[in-house]
Amino acid sequence: MSKSKDDAPHELESQFILRLPPEYASTVRRAVQSGHVNLKDRLSIELHPDGRHGIVRVDRVPLAAKLVDLPRVMESLKTIDKKTFYKTADVCQMLVSTVDGDLYPPVEEPVATADPKASKKKDKDKEKKFVWNHGITLPLKNVRKRRFRKTAKKKYIESPDVEKEVKRLLSTDAEAVSTRWEIIAEDETKETENQGLDISSPGMSGHRQGHDSLEHDELREIFNDLSSSSEDEDETQHQDEEDINIIDTEEDLERQLQDKLNESDEQHQENEGTNQLVMGIQKQIDNMKGKLQETQDRAKRQEDLIMKVENLALKNRFQAVLDELKQKEDREKEQLSSLQEELESLLEK
């Protein structure tokens, strides 16, 4: 059939959600599902003239009801064959019924006020009493406050001092006979920063030179002691022989000092190498401890899982995995013990 132009559009039904206490809700649900003809006798809704309060009777038991506005609009659908759904209404209100409520609440008489702002504010406060902050499901608790928060307004900050300073600068620029400007490139700033960093390097070199000078002073003292002792022993000999002996002792001392310096450098390098080895082995030990702890935790979880499983085939499979974890744990323990022995041997040296 073709729809004629004169046909009026289908109007949606007017619907709302009825929320009852649990014991009464189960009674109404069973009555609706059973399809009783006398459902009107068992359930009745009566609204007061204010349109917000009313009485809901379930099996002749009166319940106080209040009509509230939901935070959002929901669509109500119906179906005949459970395959195709048709929209029947937009639901935006809910009738909340309680046992301990007031069946006949006092009616608020309107007070005539000359100020329109005051009356407007009073109407707004009255509407807030019938605003429902929650949704229909539990995750939508306080949804009105969470999703409809008031946005922060940008406040205009008055700064008369800044405006006066800007005006003064503009007036001085206009009165100036000539102007001069200077451009500072980024490369120059980087060079100055590098120079500031290079200034600290002479201090480091001076520290090293001071350390070397202390070593040379000690060597000079040793040299002076040895030379003085050699002079005391050779007092009876001739002056020429003394000069020759002094020259020989100086050369020998220089060789000895050079050998000592070389030995100290080699010892320092060996110590540095040993420290690096110790740090590397310590790092390996820490990593191995972490792996061992992780393997032990996995084995513990596997044991708990085997205790809970009743299927024999599944339990055998889990047991095979547990055996592999135990073998892995033994290997990691051996590696950890070997690393600890190696570390102890290095520390003893």
Swiss-Prot record:
Acidic residues biased stretches: 230-247
Location in or out of the cell: Nucleus
Biological process per Gene Ontology, one example term: regulation of transcription by RNA polymerase II
Modified residues (Phosphoserine): S171, S200, S201, S213, S264
UniProt cross-references to InterPro entries, sorted A to Z: TAF7 (IPR037817), TAFII55_prot_cons_reg (IPR006751)
Mod. after translation: Phosphorylated by CIITA. Phosphorylation at Ser-264 by TAF1 in early G1 phase disrupts binding to TAF1. Ubiquitinated by TRIM26; leading to proteasomal degradation.
Keyword Ubl conjugation: yes
Pfam families recorded: TAFII55_N
CDD domains hit by this protein: TAF7 (cd08047)
Assembly and interaction partners: Component of the TFIID basal transcription factor complex, composed of TATA-box-binding protein TBP, and a number of TBP-associated factors (TAFs), including TAF1, TAF2, TAF3, TAF4, TAF5, TAF6, TAF7, TAF8, TAF9, TAF10, TAF11, TAF12 and TAF13. Part of a TFIID-containing RNA polymerase II pre-initiation complex that is composed of TBP and at least GTF2A1, GTF2A2, GTF2E1, GTF2E2, GTF2F1, GTF2H2, GTF2H3, GTF2H4, GTF2H5, GTF2B, TCEA1, ERCC2, ERCC3, TAF1, TAF2, TAF3, TAF4, TAF5, TAF6, TAF7, TAF8, TAF9, TAF10, TAF11, TAF12 and TAF13. Interacts with TAF1; the interaction is direct.
Family: Belongs to the TAF7 family.
Official protein name in the record: Transcription initiation factor TFIID subunit 7
Organism in which the protein naturally occurs: Bos taurus
